[in-house]
A protein has these predicted regions:
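Residue register of alpha-helical TPR repeats
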Residues: 22, 29, 69, 89, ...
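"A position-specific structural signal for the A-helix of alpha-solenoid helical repeats
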Residues: 26, 33, 66, 73, ...
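Amphipathic alpha-helical segments of tetratricopeptide repeats
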Residues: 9-19, 52-63, 93-103
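Single-residue signature of alpha-solenoid repeat helices
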Residues: 2-5, 47, 87
């Protein structure tokens, strides 16, 4: 299945049955998992785009459990696309969300990546 088709299916999921999306937190989680898969496959342009969609879905539907993860994926993809300023900003946003929420494991992942890629110390 092509990535474009999968993105279309996920997007239509939100328009066809929005109450399922909002009550089950399905759309942000699906978009996060898809963005992660694209990032790990080194498809950074697509990964960043899907991660941004995941971020927007988190905000739109008020389900923030994967917001920091979408930001981290977007940051990493932006770094590999040469968008260092955007990457710094996304890592910073992800870091502070994790800090406020007490997500210590994810906080360490973000610290490690930001230092490795951009020499940023949080």
């Amino acid at each position: 299945m092509s990535h474009g088709l999968l993105i279309g299916l996920v997007a239509s999921c939100a328009t066809l049955n929005p109450e399922t999306v909002t009550s089950n937190r399905m759309l942000p989680l699906v978009l996060y998992n898809f963005a992660r898969s694209l990032d790990l496959s080194q498809k950074y342009e697509e990964g960043a785009k899907v991660a941004r969609c995941g971020k927007e879905a988190c905000i739109k539907y008020g389900h923030y459990q994967v917001l920091h993860s979408c930001l981290e994926i977007e940051a990493e993809c932006d770094f590999f696309l040469g968008k260092k300023e955007e990457s710094v900003e996304r890592y910073r946003e992800a870091f502070y969300i994790c800090k406020v929420m007490g997500y210590e494991d994810d906080l360490q992942i973000i610290r490690t990546e930001a230092e490795k890629y951009l020499n940023i110390l949080f």
